[in-house]
C-alpha cells in the first residue's frame, strides 16, 4: 500500500485538489473512481472490487450510486505529491441534491460522458450546476474501449456545449484504465487549489452525515478556514451545540484517524452524539475554544416533490418505523415525514420524497436495514385547493381534500428536458400530450439527437412517465426535470367505496379526464383481490356523490336445499325465503374486511389497466363523452 507523505492537518493548500465526478446515470463514474483508487495505490490489489465506493448492498445490486463518497487520494505529478479529494456522486435525477452538496465541497468537476451514448439530460443538468458553483470543468469521454464508441462525434458535441476544442476532451476507459493517469495529471493542472485562510478561526461545512450504530453520528466536513485538532471541542453554529469529538480523520479509502484537519481538506468527525437532530447538513462547524464569527453559507433545503404514506403491516411496529426513519433521515437529508392515521391502515407516516426512485430506495432500505414490513400508499403531489367559501387547503394526502364545492385547484408543474434520437420525436410528443404537457422549444444538439423542452404537471410524471418514455423510444431517451411554478387544473378526488363505505387508502386526486379510467382500474383490481362473502359486495368509484364505475363481487351460494330429498316444493321455498332474509340482514350488518394482501397488491404502482376488458370499457366511455 502506498505511503502518503502529505499528512492531514499539515498539508499545504497549494497541493490540495478537491474535485467531484459528475455524469448521467450509467456513464461509468464509479468505474473511473475505482481505477483512480487503483492507480494511486491506496487500495491494495487483493482488496479491490468493482464499485469500491458503493458501500450499500442496494447500490451494489442495482449498480447505481445513491450516496456521495469522499476519498483522499495521493497523486505524484512532476515530482510533487498532491492530495486529491475525490467525491463520487450519484447520477439519477432524484439524487440531484446529493450532487449539489458535493459540488459545494469542491473546486473542480470531472464531467464524464459515455462515448457510446453522448450527452444526456442529466449530463446537462449536472454541468449547469457545476457552472453555477464556478467550478473548473474537465470534460472526459469514458468507455472508449467499446466497439460502439464514437469518441470524435461526441467530443465535438461536448466542445460545442462547453466552448472548448474537441482535442481538449480527454478520452479514458474506466474498464481498462487507459487515459486515467492523464486525467489525474489534468486535474492537478486545471483544478485550482482551495483558498481558505489557514490562520483564521476554524470553519468547516457539513456536507453529509451517516449513522453508525456503534459510534453514533459520523459527520463529513470540508474545512474552509483554519484547522481542527483531535479532541478539540467543536461548536455547531447553526443549532448552537458544543461537542467533544471522539475522533477526527480522513477517508482513504476507509476511515483513517488523524491528529488534525487543515484548511481545504475533506474529512470526517465523530462527535459521539446519538441524536439525529444534532448534525444538520449545511451547518458550519467551528472550534469552541476560538470560534469563528460568521457561519458559511449553507444549502437550500431540498423540497419534496412526491408524497406517499408508509404504514407498518403490523401496527405494533410503529415505534420501530419512527426510529428507522429518524436514523435514515441522517443519511438522507432530503427525506421528510410526519405521523398520520388512516382508518384502513392504522398509524403510519406521510413521507416526502424527491422522486419515485428516491421513494423506492427509502422503502427498500427500511425493509433491509431495519427489517420492517411496510405498505406504501399510491404516490401523489401537493395541491393548493381553494374551497367555495374561500378557505385555503394545502393538500398532501387525498384524505385532506375538502368536501363540497371547489373554486380552484393549483397543481405543481415541472420543466422537463428530454433528449431523444430524432426518429422518436413523434412518439415523445404523443406521450407528453397524453400527460397534459405543453410544448416549449426544441433544438438539435447533433445531427441525429434532439433536446425537447416541455412543461408538464408533476403529478403526470411521478407515476409511470419515465417507464413509458423508455419503452416508446426503445430506451434511448433521457429525462431531466426541475420545478417550474404551478397552474390551476380541473382535478377531482376519486373515492373508492366498498359496500358503500369509503376506503381512504384507495382515494386519489386525478384529472377529470382520467377519473373514469382510474375508477375502472381500481374497482377491477379490487374485485379480483377481495375474497367473496355470503352476500354480494359492490365496489364503486365515486366523485363526490356521483358513482362513475362499479364492479360486484358475487355472493357465495350456500346450498340450503342439500338436505331435502324430493318432497314438497313449499318446504324448499320456505328454506330459500329464510336464506334470502338472512342474506338481506347480513348485507345490512355485514362488514367487509379488506385483507392486507389486497391493500399491498392494489396499491402497488404496477398498473393493471393493460388487460383488454378494461381498455375496451375506457374507450367506450370516452366515445360516449366525445
From Swiss-Prot:
Residues 603-626 are annotated as: Disordered. Keywords: Cell membrane, GTP-binding, Hydrolase, Membrane, Nucleotide-binding, Protein biosynthesis. SMART domains: EFG_C (SM00838). Belongs to the TRAFAC class translation factor GTPase superfamily. Classic translation factor GTPase family. LepA subfamily. It catalyses: GTP + H2O = GDP + phosphate + H(+). The keyword Zinc-finger does not apply. GO terms for molecular function: GTP binding; GTPase activity; ribosome binding; translation elongation factor activity. The keyword DNA repair does not apply. GO terms for cellular component: plasma membrane. InterPro entries: EF-4, EFG_III/V, EFG_V-like, EFTu-like_2, G_TR_CS, LepA_C_sf, LepA_CTD, LepA_IV. Residues 14-195 form the tr-type G domain. It is found in: Cell membrane. GTP binds at residues 26-31, 142-145. CDD domains: EF4_II, EF4_III, LepA, lepA_C. Residues 609-626 have a biased composition (Basic and acidic residues). Its EC number is 3.6.5.n1. HAMAP family: LepA. PROSITE patterns: G_TR_1, G_TR_2. It is a peripheral membrane protein. Required for accurate and efficient protein synthesis under certain stress conditions. May act as a fidelity factor of the translation reaction, by catalyzing a one-codon backward translocation of tRNAs on improperly translocated ribosomes. Back-translocation proceeds from a post-translocation (POST) complex to a pre-translocation (PRE) complex, thus giving elongation factor G a second chance to translocate the tRNAs correctly. Binds to ribosomes in a GTP-dependent manner. GO terms for biological process: positive regulation of translation. Pfam families: EFG_C (PF00679), GTP_EFTU (PF00009), GTP_EFTU_D2 (PF03144), LepA_C (PF06421). This is Elongation factor 4.
